[in-house]
A protein has these predicted regions:
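Adenosine-phosphate binding glycine-rich loop
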Residues: 2-25, 221-222, 336-449
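Flexible, glycine/charged-enriched surface loops at secondary-structure junctions
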Residues: 20-23, 39-46, 119, 156-165, ...
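Structured beta-strand/loop patches that form or line metal/cofactor-binding pockets in enzymes
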Residues: 42-71
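Glycine/serine-rich phosphate-binding loop and adjoining beta1-alpha1 elements at the start
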Residues: 96, 115-230
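General beta-strand structural signal in soluble alpha/beta enzymes
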Residues: 106, 160-164, 188-192, 259-262, ...
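Glycine-rich phosphate/diphosphate-binding loop of Rossmann-like nucleotide-binding domains
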Residues: 202-314
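Rossmann-like adenosine-cofactor binding region
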Residues: 265-367, 372
Length: 449
């Protein structure tokens, strides 16, 4: 392994030893960059990797709000502005109890390369809070969002930092956040947030974009293997917005999703989530606040496996769509034993490094990384920014056509970067190399800043 890369990883481990998620993503990305680092000794002279792994700015703040009982609650808010070399900081806001600085830094670091892969001018950032919206009333969520934005508004803007939604932050939350921003700033800057409602500057296809984009990327992988999506059975986790997008597009293209999963377990539907009634019910489940996938089993009379993950279920394709590190060695071994050929990461870093590298070594198994696969969400966010800047609204067909093109190019650029480095069809390394190159070129051109 390259000595410079090892030195930077060691420094990160020593300085950020309490941030396991961040260390994990830094190790995975930097180790895959060896071919490019070897070719460019000027990167070490410029301290490029040291600068790359250090956020430009970390903002941490308290978020006080009043609950339904009139009691004051205090949560912690974050915004990690990781890298602005190729554009304003861009990345979602996550409201979930597991949110901490390590998670925010890992997501912001990944976002930097993901945004670069889209070819759109967006830097990397991420934010959120340890506030859990599950079980909260609309009024409580509104008060929290207003308090959160009262501080965040100091640090964002259409040409500075453009947040969006993520886990726990959907259209309702974006609306509350935008309303508070507009109230405080006294200006209608609809480019300050993406994922907005269509009535105030949002884009068609945005809710579906991450799931749709993941399936479009999958289709490019299948095409490379002289295969097709038609008739394929797909196992996924989650049942939220991303999973719904995957189910919808898979059905449209002739495949079927046979599992959904939540905190309570998973369901197996041999007929697939392949009717409009089932897809509509996924939206009902997501908006109910119950967070139970068993509701699907009860309604449609399919099998429910309490407390289990879906990865023991035989499928042609596995697409984890839930949380980071949901796939460990135990799950990876089940996926391999079932003869799954295509492992397509959709959630951010859903696989531990050990499990990821183990699956990548399996003969005939194709592994695709989340930073490429799930880039459709931020790609359409970028297209929303473009529409806001031009004061235009594109049709769903226009947005979808651009999304297809972006996902095709991400696959093509990743494939070519891996081939150029002599790594064959290694989509994991290829995505890291392709995303890194653009950011590195910009950082080198802009001096030591």
């Amino acid at each position: 392994m390259n000595a410079y890369i090892e030195e930077v990883i060691a420094k990160v481990k020593a300085r950020d030893s309490h941030e396991p998620e961040f260390i994990q993503t830094v190790e995975e990305v930097l180790r895959s960059l060896e071919p490019m680092i070897e070719k460019h000794p000027e990167y070490q002279e410029a301290g490029l990797l040291e600068r790359l792994v250090e956020p430009e700015r970390v903002i941490e703040f308290r978020v006080p709000w009043v609950d339904r009982e009139g009691k004051v609650q205090v949560n912690r808010g974050f915004r990690v502005q990781f890298n602005s070399a190729i554009g304003p900081y861009k990345g979602g806001l996550r409201f979930a109890s597991h949110v901490n600085l390590s998670v925010m830094k890992f997501l912001g670091f990944e976002q930097t390369f993901k945004n670069s892969l889209t070819s759109l001018p967006m830097g990397g950032g991420k934010g959120g809070s340890d506030f859990d919206p599950n079980g909260k009333t609309d009024a409580e969520i509104m008060r929290f969002c207003q308090s959160f934005m009262t501080e965040l508004q100091r640090h964002i803007g259409p040409n500075v930092d453009v947040p969006a939604g993520d886990i726990g932050v959907g259209g309702r939350e974006i609306g509350f956040l935008f309303g508070q921003y507009k109230k405080i700033r006294g200006a209608y800057e609809n480019g300050v947030l993406t994922g907005k409602g269509l009535s105030f500057g949002g884009s068609l296809i945005r809710p579906e974009a991450t799931g749709f984009g993941a399936v479009y990327y999958l289709c490019e992988v299948l095409k490379h293997e002289n295969d097709t999506i038609e008739g394929k059975e797909i196992a996924i986790s989650g049942f939220g917005n991303v999973s719904w997008g995957v189910c919808t597009k898979a059905m449209q293209l002739g495949a079927k999703v046979i599992t959904l999963a939540g905190p309570d377990g998973y369901i197996y539907d041999p007929d697939g989530v392949c009717t409009q009634e089932k897809l509509d019910y996924m939206l009902v489940m997501r908006n109910s606040g119950r967070n139970k996938v068993q509701d699907y089993a009860d309604k449609f009379g399919v099998q429910f496996f309490p407390g289990q993950k879906p990865w023991g279920q035989k499928a042609d394709i596995c697409m984890p769509c839930a949380y980071q590190n949901e796939i460990r060695m135990e799950e990876a071994e089940k996926i391999i034993a079932n003869g799954t050929k295509y492992y397509i990461e959709v959630a951010n870093m859903p696989t531990t490094n050990e499990a990821l590298f183990h699956m990548m070594k399996q003969p005939g198994m194709i592994v695709a990384p989340s930073k490429a696969v799930n880039a459709g969400g931020v790609a359409v966010s970028g297209l929303e920014m473009s529409q806001n800047s031009e004061r235009l609204a594109w049709s769903a067909e226009e947005v979808d056509e651009k999304l297809v093109t972006i996902m095709k190019n991400i696959h093509k650029n990743s494939m070519e970067a891996a081939a150029e480095a002599g790594l064959g069809y290694n989509l994991v390394a290829g995505a890291n190399l392709a995303g890194f190159k653009k950011v590195a070129d910009a950082m080198m051109a802009q001096g030591i800043v």
